[in-house]
Amino acid sequence: RAILLGNLAQQHPDYSLLEQLSGELATMTGASAGTVGEAANSVGGYIAKACPQQGGRDAARLFAEPRKAYVLFGCEPSLDVANPAQALRALNAAEMVVQFATFKDADALAYADVLLPLAPYTETSGTFVNGEGRAQSFVGVVRPTGQSRPGWKLLRVLGNLLNVEGFDYMSSEEVRNEILGAEGTLPEGVLARMLPVTAAVPTPVQGSGLQRIADVPIYFADALVRRAPSLQKTRDAQVPVA
């Protein structure tokens, strides 16, 4: 017996409550509880703390409550967020926008003050951590094109220019080992300790009105597959018909 929470549950405003209830239900019924990861490296992102910490703002709030400056990393707001119009308004009104971009997008040219050439995931080495906590390292299939560079190298150079400590990595393996340890693997039980189900975080939700629930087609999930003509001709890329 197993209770699994999927992507729609993770996008729910009360996901923390759903996770807590599923854990309690699993305990009462003797079932296993788990979550189907939203992306290939969702767990890795949590381990690296690439998510709002205590008192931090998530992406939705950063656009709903406009900031003076934004740094976008491998993100195309017009296609990657739930409310692209709101995101573009915030970006166009900002005093400074720096974007690490793989493609020179027309929207980005309008709002970005600086575009840094980011190599796609196919042109860099790195490590993903999957839903069961397994670290999976890989290498780039080709060298980065032109002046584009892997993301970790761009961040390292910026850190060096700003004289920030801790930006002396010489390889993606060194970055991985900084996060996962010298062995480059997760200690047993680290996921359970990292994401304890202890309390729900209340999120105000409007009691009436419309809520958008949308599926992201498999070949529309990132900047690379969106621009692959062969993939866009497949049946899986077609717009759903009600």
Describe each model-derived feature in a short phrase.
Residues A2-A64, R212-V216, L224, P229:
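A glycine-rich, hydrophobic/aromatic-adjacent loop/helix-cap motif
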